[in-house]
Amino acid sequence: MIQPQTHLNVADNSGARELMCIRIIGTSNRRYAHIGDVIVAVIKEVVPNMPLERSEVIRAVIVRTCKELKRDNGMIIRYDDNAAVIIDQEGNPKGTRIFGAIVRELRQLNFTKIVSLAPEVL
């Protein structure tokens, strides 16, 4: 569960290392974001000599959470970290590589480009 002020790792090579959630996109009174939700975040830590800068406001989609994801078949998926992928206004990732495993539910949420770049889909 991701809420405002939560720090997340960045799971792509866009140039940012750490994000902080400042808003959850969707209904006006949503308290938590889960895997597949789009958030507004601010960049807290960057890689040197990359196009993104610190304190830049961006959109990101959550791809991993420490809170478990329950599937209809009874499988429970839980990760060791909270991670997101930076996207543009159309929903395409800004980076060209995705690091770490992601869940296949992102394909149903029309993030097929992120799923195709991922090295492992659970």
From Swiss-Prot:
GO terms for biological process: translation. Coiled coil: none annotated. SUPFAM superfamilies: Ribosomal protein L14 (SSF50193). Pfam families: Ribosomal_L14. InterPro entries: Ribosomal_uL14 (IPR000218), Ribosomal_uL14_bac-type (IPR005745), Ribosomal_uL14_CS (IPR019972), Ribosomal_uL14_sf (IPR036853). GO terms for molecular function: large ribosomal subunit rRNA binding; structural constituent of ribosome. Keywords: Chloroplast, Plastid, Ribonucleoprotein, Ribosomal protein, RNA-binding, rRNA-binding. One of its GO terms (cellular component) is cytosolic large ribosomal subunit. CDD domains: Ribosomal_uL14. The keyword Ribosomal protein applies. It is found in: Plastid, Chloroplast. Its main location: plastid. The keyword Ribosomal protein applies. Binds to 23S rRNA. Belongs to the universal ribosomal protein uL14 family. Part of the 50S ribosomal subunit. This is Large ribosomal subunit protein uL14c.
